[in-house]
Amino acid sequence: RDRSPSRGLGDVYKRQDLDIDDFKQLKPEDYWYSVIYGEGSCYTGEDIRKRTKKFWIWKDNMSWKIEELRLYFKDMQTRLKKDHPELFLCPDLSQWGYFLNVYSQKQCDSDNPDYSELWDTAMRGIDMYAISPYVDSCHFITVPARPDASPDAYVTSCQHSMMRVMNEGKECIGGIYWGRYIYRDLYAFLTPEEIVGTMTACGVDGYTSYGMNGLDDGGVLNRMEDDFLDSLRRGNTWCAEVIPKRGKSKFKEIAILFPSEMSDYEPFDVENNEIRRLDMLGWYEICCDLGYQTDVISYHDILENKLNDYKMLIVPSNDCYFAEEHTDMEKMIREWVTNGGVVLHGPDCGLSKNCFGIQGIPCEKTPYIYQKPVIPQGCEFQRYETGRCISAYADDAGKCIVMQEIEKGKVISCGVQLGASYVAKNIPHVPYEQRNKEMYPIIQARSTLLEDLLGVCGKPVSGICERGIEAGVFETGMVLVNHRSTPYEIGNLKGNRKFTNPVNDTVLLPHSAVWIERE
């Protein structure tokens, strides 16, 4: 599996220190990771940074699995459709999400053994974006929980954004887990109608669910309380009425580049992997909270010239970007930027280095300034020597965020992982060296930094800019979902309303949804 014709088996032999010239000379102890390093072992972050043989063998093993699975689906599509063209191919590609999986190794206790290899799709050898052409609907089950199993409806929203992209021009069948989750009672914090609202806002044509029964995985929907079942009934009744009115034409504003290489090759066990995964989720939440219509696209979509549908491309953390060649994609991104597109990326970004020659310099974890001091979070920190300074590190430690204009377009380079900072589980203390200065993490700084960064590509079509309020904008109207624990006032919005749980025409209850039809 190789994205560039310039790479061949000679490169594979070289990076694995193999002194051979014929593939048939290979033995399992030459190329198979578990034979060489033992079952259950994993490479480290140091192996990534130093591009060691250990990393390359893992990568090449996973590449083979991914390509074999892609070829399997391609072959099965041909076989099944040949004799039964009426078949609708919609396999469940994953039981527990994609990329934003629960890191169950940290959740298991004496009652539950460690199933982390089953849950983490980075251990599976699967690229769902690559499989999507061979099914009628590319589909998997989502769980509204972060890697630490804490409830988060935006995880389901983000993964349905992926599915919407995978199924452009086709039926989009969503997937959700209902019931008492094995690691956390998710629906004690979320409601079914809220999640149905999120899937509807993401553009699904319908959905399938998991959790009807089976105590081994939680679920047991038949054992859930009446308030859960009532909420599920309200959500299903609502979406059955709204989806035909809503249609399929969802607006597009911002694209987030799915970190395919990290998804393919880097499991949770690599240090700080969880933070890097959360960086993508954090950027998705930022975009939603600021009202933008956001899609998580892959390099496959850029190669199909779909980047022209968007105003901004956000590149989240991806320390495995170097593991594949991206010559054609990078050329297309450069052309898109020169014609007016905006790229926003974080520290240690291989894409910005290859596309634009922009490379940060590693630096200490230091507060940065935008209107007021902000405490940094994340695991990567860099400063930049060139570009117009948008935010500087405190104590003259250099430029933290810079912007460079490239013909009609712009590149915004961030020295901190703003996405990971936005969804960090904990908030930090003021750094000791800052003594008694007043400063806060980005989520509490009351700075307009994030709004101003995304505002470079224009104002959101939704007109909504509220944390915890998700908006899905379609040609015929808008779906609003209230993820907050407090009601949201919508009296200023025009259009006929259809609530999942109505009280009057102006109040959207916590953890519920509304369809507002365009007048």
Feature-to-residue mapping (PLM):
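A short helix->loop->beta-strand "cap" motif at the edges of active sites that frequently abuts
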Residues: 85-87, 167-170, 338-342, 409
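Hydrophobic faces of well-ordered beta-strands that scaffold small-molecule active sites
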Residues: 89-91, 138-140, 172-176, 206-210
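Polysaccharide-binding and catalytic clefts of secreted carbohydrate-active enzymes
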Residues: 1, 7-158, 162
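Active-site clefts of carbohydrate-active enzymes
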Residues: 94-102, 158-191, 214-222, 258-265
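Aromatic-Pro/Gly-enriched surface loop or interdomain linker
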Residues: 204, 221-308, 474-476
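The substrate-binding groove and active-site-proximal loops of carbohydrate-active enzymes
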Residues: 51-71, 95, 112, 141-152, ...
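Helix-enriched interaction subdomains in cytosolic or periplasmic regions
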Residues: 191-235
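A conserved amphipathic helix/loop scaffold
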Residues: 188, 317-519
